[in-house]
Amino acid sequence: ETLKESTQQSLWIELFAGGRYSSHSTNDLRKESLEKFLTNAVDLTGFLTKDEFRRLADPELYEGQSKVDLDLNDSGQADITAEQRQERAKQLGAYLEGKDERIISVASGVYDSHSESYQLASNGFEGQKESTSFTQGVSVSLQGKGDKKPEGWRYYRARHLNDLVGAEQIAKEALART
């Protein structure tokens, strides 16, 4: 019944300055805003208490880091349409139709995300990561004894769409947990 879709971008920085550490984030990526954001972040870090134990890692610790592909990204995620997401959510709820006369309500959800990050440190560290995440699940409310209304749910998450547990199994488990 309700379909929501969004795209988000943000910048997150960690500062190690003068023996102090701070982290800052913003989703305002306009050049003039970023300049002020960075200036303020550096200035604010100067007000913090020094922390002798918080510092950049020794470059020897990440020298020769592996370039192995950890298979964190499903390249097909970008091709999934809003209609396909809606159909998957409907399928989750459809498996519960008529399964128990005590069912009051069913809510299903399908979520997927794509994330890219790039890290660069002043001590020479450089790294990047790209990953996807897929989640689908359902919650169900039943009419219990008297005015009790127990609720059960089941959600699964995977890095790749094809690795997700099927809609029928998810629906059965949610009902069994109620």
Name the predicted role of every residue range:
Residues 1-178:
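Active-site bordering "gate/hinge" segments
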